[in-house]
């Protein structure tokens, strides 16, 4: 049986999770908050100095996060004047933010260009791009007054970003990094199509070398935990016999069995 290209597999997954919305021109909208959902919200502490809602599609008001607090797609928003960013040196910034492993920093610090790294600069002809560069160019940060989540801010600014200077991703050798770029590119293009509403999506979980972590999970914006599954690190294809569950599928067990 011939192998199905990874990009095609992702396209199928995206089509399965895209639903046609009813509001033209607003493709990145969360599902409406029903009275039942709002009734289940816990009260906000009286000591809270700034009330906001969660950064994802949660319905409950939350206390805005202070400077230095952990943050991400599904957490409360950072307080006014702060932005949620991946920690310095984070090898998987996009994935870290979907897991709530970012931190609230001053907006001035978040928008400042990174200091040059020690060592030799990359060749100007290089078409390599790291996940950290993706984070910087997609501006993965959201002030507390924004209506969209951190991740939607990233996707909405992607198409207009001219800082990537990517000329030919076919020259890239890292399969997960290639898929990550294509996923975000496809989501950005989907935003241009009015009426689309995405509540679940998949961002490849890449290691620092651009290959796949054995556990891959979808990200859910509807409050429900996303599905996780196991893949081979070198090509991202499902490990036969491994489960697809909402939780930890213990991929190392299945990986060891296959090897």
From Swiss-Prot:
Gene3D superfamilies: 4.10.40.20, Thyroglobulin type-1. GO terms for molecular function: insulin-like growth factor binding; insulin-like growth factor I binding; insulin-like growth factor II binding; signaling receptor binding. It comes from the Eukaryota. Residues 26-107 form the IGFBP N-terminal domain. CDD domains: TY. The modification Phosphotyrosine is found at residue 158. Disulfide bonds join 30-57, 33-59, 41-60, 48-63, 71-84, 78-104, 176-206, 217-228, 230-251. Changing residue 246 to W: Loss of binding to ITGA5. Residues 173-251 form the Thyroglobulin type-1 domain. The keyword Cytoplasm does not apply. GO terms for biological process: insulin receptor signaling pathway; negative regulation of canonical Wnt signaling pathway; positive regulation of cell growth; regulation of insulin-like growth factor receptor signaling pathway; signal transduction; tissue regeneration. Transmembrane segments: none annotated. Its main location: secreted. The modification Phosphoserine is found at residues 45, 120, 123, 126, 144, 156, 194, 199, 242. It is found in: Secreted. Residues 1-25 form the signal peptide. Phosphorylated; probably by casein kinase II. Phosphorylation alters the affinity of the protein for IGFs. In amniotic fluid, the unmodified protein is the most abundant form, while mono-, bi-, tri- and tetraphosphorylated forms are present in decreasing amounts. The phosphorylation state may influence the propensity to proteolysis. The modification Phosphothreonine is found at residues 157, 193. GO terms for cellular component: endoplasmic reticulum lumen; extracellular region; extracellular space; Golgi apparatus. A motif (Cell attachment site) lies at residues 246-248. Keywords: Disulfide bond, Growth factor binding, Phosphoprotein, Secreted, Signal. PROSITE patterns: IGFBP_N_1, IGFBP_N_2, THYROGLOBULIN_1_1, THYROGLOBULIN_1_2. Binds equally well IGF1 and IGF2. Interacts with integrin ITGA5:ITGB1. Interacts with VHL; this interaction inhibits HIF1A degradation. Multifunctional protein that plays a critical role in regulating the availability of IGFs such as IGF1 and IGF2 to their receptors and thereby regulates IGF-mediated cellular processes including cell migration, proliferation, differentiation or apoptosis in a cell-type specific manner. Also plays a positive role in cell migration by interacting with integrin ITGA5:ITGB1 through its RGD motif. Mechanistically, binding to integrins leads to activation of focal adhesion kinase/PTK2 and stimulation of the mitogen-activated protein kinase (MAPK) pathway. This is Insulin-like growth factor-binding protein 1. The lineage of its organism: Eukaryota, Metazoa, Chordata, Craniata, Vertebrata. The gene is IGFBP1.
């Amino acid at each position: 049986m011939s192998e199905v290209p990874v990009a095609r597999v992702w396209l199928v997954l995206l089509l399965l999770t895209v639903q046609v919305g009813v509001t033209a021109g607003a493709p990145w909208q969360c599902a409406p908050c029903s009275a039942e959902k709002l009734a289940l919200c816990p009260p906000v502490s009286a000591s809270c100095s700034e009330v906001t809602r969660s950064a994802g599609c949660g319905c409950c008001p939350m206390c805005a996060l202070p400077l230095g607090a952990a943050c991400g797609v599904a957490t409360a928003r950072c307080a006014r004047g702060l932005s949620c960013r991946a920690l310095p040196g984070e090898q998987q910034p996009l994935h870290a933010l979907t897991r709530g492993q970012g931190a609230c920093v001053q907006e001035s610090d978040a928008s400042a260009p990174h200091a040059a790294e020690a060592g030799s600069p990359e060749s100007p002809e290089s078409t390599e791009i790291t996940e950290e560069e993706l984070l910087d160019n997609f501006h993965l940060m959201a002030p507390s007054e924004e209506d969209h989540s951190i991740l939607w801010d990233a996707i909405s600014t992607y198409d207009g970003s001219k800082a990537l200077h990517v000329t030919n991703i076919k020259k890239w050798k890292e399969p997960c990094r290639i898929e990550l770029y294509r996923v975000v590119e496809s989501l950005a293009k989907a935003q241009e199509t009015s009426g689309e509403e995405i509540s679940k999506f998949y961002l490849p979980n890449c290691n620092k070398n651009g290959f796949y972590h054995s556990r891959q999970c979808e990200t859910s914006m509807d409050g429900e935990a996303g599905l996780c599954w196991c893949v081979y690190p070198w090509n991202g294809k499902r490990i036969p016999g491994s489960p697809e569950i909402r939780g930890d599928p213990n991929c190392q067990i299945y990986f060891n069995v296959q090897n």
